[in-house]
Amino acid sequence: MKKFLAILLLAGCVSGVEAQNNANEKTLFEEVTGLKKKSDKFNFFLNMNGSFDAMDNQAGKSGKFNMRQLRIEAKGQVNDWLSYRWRQRLNRSNAQGNNIDNMPTSIDIAGIGVKLSDKWSMFAGKQCANYGGVEFDLNPIEIYEYSDMIENMSNFMTGVNFAYDATPNHQFNFQVLNSLNGTFTETYGDVPVEMTKLPLVYTLNWCGNFNNVFKTRWSASIMNQAKDKNMTYIALGNELSLGKFGMFLDFMYSKEDIDRKRIMTSMLGGGASLPSAEYMSIVT
């Protein structure tokens, strides 16, 4: 299917907390809870990305309006050490099905953040995998079409992330997440392997900033796919800014004992995932 026309309809964020015109007049929230409402405690966002898609394929020519992204998000800072974040897609099914974390895939993020010290913090709950790459870190409403590797990855899973701020410009993360959303069969098909007892993915991440000229977002991950079957994923995101000139270069490599992304499996007719696959991608 070839898409040759796309029009960005709307991409924006709407803040859900506004000050009263009269500072002496209490809001409904204050009347009910007795608490003074502050913008850092609750913020609401609406993220939208739409297009008009014109297609020319074997079925003929056609066109339609398409709402690519429609997400609502609430996040806030409860106090100086506790925060929360929730983001959900309105154009994805809310059925939780057989999801191992008991949450529907429409929920991208749902968890709490805790500041453990001046340098250490953690986030527990459903969250985005801390993979490297500049493209991977962009807001989805800013993306028209992801590269094939990112488009076919599972990016939102449940677990915990620990962050260490070595300096104001360098942060290191260690993250442990479920490696599945649904069941093993839903993810890989009928593959003749023994399931692992700990379907987890472990990620080390480094976010660096060198005088706002060169920035890094690098990661290394290992995923338990099945017993004695693993996936190794390396992502090196690099961003360069020189005055009015800017560019980024992402390098991604994935070695999978079971074809997790299923790109090669789909090219060969679908069905159960191939017993092994390797992918490499460069995006700039």
Segments (PLM) and residue ranges:
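Beta-barrel outer-membrane channel/assembly domains of diderm bacteria
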Residues: 19-122, 162-172, 239-241
